């Protein structure tokens, strides 16, 4: 959000940009960054709450779906909660976007959804399939859904780089295998990928 919002405001100058999340502290911090910008609105809510989604989506044309339980150990430990957010939350958003006439929706996914080996990856794969199938679920509504799968986003919350930076003072960085490679993109590249999806999406 901290990267997507200013880049989108600068490039597209939308009439209204709504940040919808359940974390009031993060919203409070973002409000200070965009104080005085009437284009930016903040709504507390949860994708699990369908009624709140309907209210939040009133008059909205484009949606970026980034809500997820995404810390792998947390997803394994609180598995029911992970499913409620990542799967049921996706279903709620699909229904609400269709009913409210949203034009285009891009759901952010992960490389962990490809041949998943943990619950987080499995729920994101399920979410991806739901969004793709949403295109055949729209009926007469002119709503399109697409999914983009990120690699590791450098500097994002939960990525390996902030983790390494937090422990580098100890002088030892844990590497699973010295042959291991990770696909990385920058935060800015992640935003541009979403823009590209909005511009070129055919649904899927």
Predicted feature locations:
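Canonical Rossmann dinucleotide-binding motif of NAD(H)/NADP(H)-dependent dehydrogenases/reductases
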Residues: 1-13
């Amino acid at each position: 959000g901290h990267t997507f919002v200013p880049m989108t405001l600068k490039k597209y100058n939308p009439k209204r940009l709504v940040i919808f999340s359940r974390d009031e502290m993060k919203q409070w911090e973002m409000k200070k960054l965009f104080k005085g910008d009437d284009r930016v609105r903040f709504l507390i809510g949860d994708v699990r709450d369908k009624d709140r989604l309907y209210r939040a989506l009133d008059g909205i044309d484009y949606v970026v779906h980034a809500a997820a339980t995404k810390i792998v150990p947390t997803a394994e430990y609180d598995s029911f909660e992970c499913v409620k957010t990542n799967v049921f939350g996706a279903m709620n958003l699909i229904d609400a976007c269709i009913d409210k006439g949203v034009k285009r929706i891009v759901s952010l996914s992960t490389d962990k959804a490809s041949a998943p080996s943990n619950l987080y990856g499995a729920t994101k794969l399920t979410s991806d399939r739901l969004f793709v199938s949403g295109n055949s679920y729209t009926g007469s509504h002119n709503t399109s859904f697409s999914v983009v799968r990120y690699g590791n986003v450098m500097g994002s919350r939960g990525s390996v780089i902030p983790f390494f930076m937090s422990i580098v003072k100890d002088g030892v960085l844990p590497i699973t295998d010295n042959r291991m490679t990770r696909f990385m993109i920058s935060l800015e590249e992640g935003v541009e990928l979403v823009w590209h999806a909005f511009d070129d999406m055919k649904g899927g």
